[in-house]
Amino acid sequence: MAGRWLDPLWAPGFLCVALILETASGAGDLSTKAHGHIQFSARGVNQTAMADCRAVCSLNTSDRCDFVKRNPDCHSEGGYLDYLKGIFCYFPPNLLPLAITLYVFWLLYLFLILGVTAAKFFCPNLSAISTSLKLSHNVAGVTFLAFGNGAPDIFSALVAFSDPRTAGLAIGALFGAGVLVTTVVAGGITILRPFMAASRPFLRDITFYMVAVFLTFTALYLGRITLVWALGYLGLYVFYVVTVIICTWVYQRQRSRSLVHSISETPELLTDSEEDQMSSNTNSYDYGEEYRPLLLGEETTGQILLQALNPLDYRKWRTQSISCKLLKVAKLPVEFLLLLTVPVVDPDKDDRNWKRPLNCLQLVISPLVLVLTLQSGVYGIYEIGGLLPVWAVVVIVGTALASVTFFATSNSEPPRLHWLFAFLGFLTSALWINAAATEVVNILRSLGVVFRLSNTVLGLTLLAWGNSIGDAFSDFTLARQGYPRMAFSACFGGIIFNILVGVGLGCLLQIVRSHASEVKLEPDGLLVWVLASALGLSLVFSLVSVPLQCFQLSKAYGLCLLLFYICFIVVVLLTEFGVIHLKAD
């Protein structure tokens, strides 16, 4: 039996040894330092000589604040808060642990903001847009919904690539999330519920992902990403979308011709085509159920507004556990702010989630949020002709538009152009996610300065964990409910979008922004090769072992993946702290 070949416990050990050997040999010809981080720069852009900001911790406590203020390497490109200045200028040295603790709690809350915004506001509006454009489920699943599910990862990558000093976070987070999802999440699914994998979607997705990883590994080896290379990433994703559409069409055509008798639909008898369709919608959120009003019948404008702004469902509140209630309390301020600023269109409801007073109010507030979050509010405070700032003009125009809409519509029936609110909600939620992602990147960089950690290790641990934990819980829940194939398919489908669009679009925007011909990559540490090798080994292991098991995934396979991730983290930490290093020539 081919499946029994993988049962012995030496498989995880073999993977760990292979990871260490791949790390030592793959980077053996590189003249690099043992402890370092990826440095990115755009060719043709003047760069100011500066000291590494992480040197601040080696200075006297009285000199740290002045060093942070004067050193350009300690300044953030975007964001609303200066975290390094807060640590070294506003907190006394003896309260540094308190500052770090507060930053960690704020980081966790930012991850919560990212998750709530993406799940309850960004994804529903993308779904409404795809419905308005009459896209098929497969096209919507690999485009709009993939963008919605990967929004935190994508925006974190775009923000990180925008600053050469934090671009290592992007590579670390995208590769780190890839290792995490293909080992811990995929392995956890098979441990919770062993199942028969869908062969064609699995082979297709893992092949495309391996090509994407190989392209990124090659770019790191060459030390640059050109404009053509960045466009190639995006073109490869377009080719992936076309492949999914064609494969689905061919399969459905063959099925319609060869179908002789009907097959009863059970959770484990889903076809490959149905698996694709369902996995593309795994993370959609039924926001209408939670915010459904308690009162029925004719309601006044004031009642509609109050109920639309209420993020708490009292019926669910009474049945929730203490931990769920505490989490809900933490989310209430975020949900209220998002309900106030982000319109949501629901094509599945009779009224399409039309809330006349709230939607009219959002015509004023949402554009204001757009100009105040774009580039951290730089454009919002710009004065037009030296008379009025942009935000004031936006408020005036929005108020006029809201007044016309309010008096031209009714509470009971949505207007004919109500679907346009989905685009407004999409833009507003996207900029909220971008603003939160900017703060996440800045906090992680500040923690890296304090603990003298490279951006790469922060990206592959904290940033990757934070952005992937929501998808992990969703996939585990699907597996426990009897849909492991759907959850397993979602593991590989989502990370393809993240790496191709994250790297491609991030580098493309950096090239356009800096007016350079390429983005130069300078991996001066062994850690990035550990990361790339680990991801490649995990994919090769799955590509070989899954077909050998005849696509019948067992708990032993899941345990091998989990042990591999543990070995990977151990090797990463040993490399980061210089225990594993290259010998000097």
UniProtKB/Swiss-Prot annotation:
In the record, biological process GO terms are: calcium export from the mitochondrion; calcium ion transmembrane transport; glucose homeostasis; intracellular calcium ion homeostasis; mitochondrial calcium ion homeostasis; mitochondrial calcium ion transmembrane transport; regulation of cardiac muscle cell membrane potential; regulation of cytosolic calcium ion concentration
Disulfide partners: none
Give the stretches traversing the membrane.
Answer: 96-116, 141-161, 169-189, 206-226, 228-247, 326-346, 361-381, 384-404, 417-437, 446-466, 492-512, 526-546, 560-580
Annotated membrane topology: Multi-pass membrane protein
**InterPro entries annotated for this entry?**
CaCA_antiporter (IPR051359), NaCa_Exmemb (IPR004837), NCX_ion-bd_dom_sf (IPR044880)
Please verify whether the record's keywords include Signal: yes
Sugar-modified residues: N46
Q: Which reaction equations make up its catalytic activity?
A: Ca(2+)(in) + 3 Na(+)(out) = Ca(2+)(out) + 3 Na(+)(in); 3 Li(+)(out) + Ca(2+)(in) = 3 Li(+)(in) + Ca(2+)(out)
Quote any Pfam family the record assigns. Na_Ca_ex
User: What influences the activity of this protein, per its activity regulation comment?
Assistant: Inhibited by the sodium/calcium exchanger inhibitor CGP-37157. Strongly inhibited by zinc.
Q: Which residues form the signal peptide?
A: 1-26
Tissue specificity remark: Widely expressed. Present at higher level in pancreas, stomach, skeletal muscle and skin (at protein level). Ubiquitously expressed.
Residues carrying Phosphoserine = S258
Q: List keywords of the entry alphabetically.
A: Antiport, Calcium, Calcium transport, Glycoprotein, Ion transport, Lithium, Membrane, Mitochondrion, Mitochondrion inner membrane, Phosphoprotein, Sensory transduction, Signal, Sodium, Sodium transport, Transmembrane, Transmembrane helix, Transport
PANTHER family documented for this protein: MITOCHONDRIAL SODIUM_CALCIUM EXCHANGER PROTEIN (PTHR12266:SF0), NA+/CA2+ K+ INDEPENDENT EXCHANGER (PTHR12266)
Recorded protein name is: Mitochondrial sodium/calcium exchanger protein
Whichever gene encodes this chain, its name is: Slc8b1
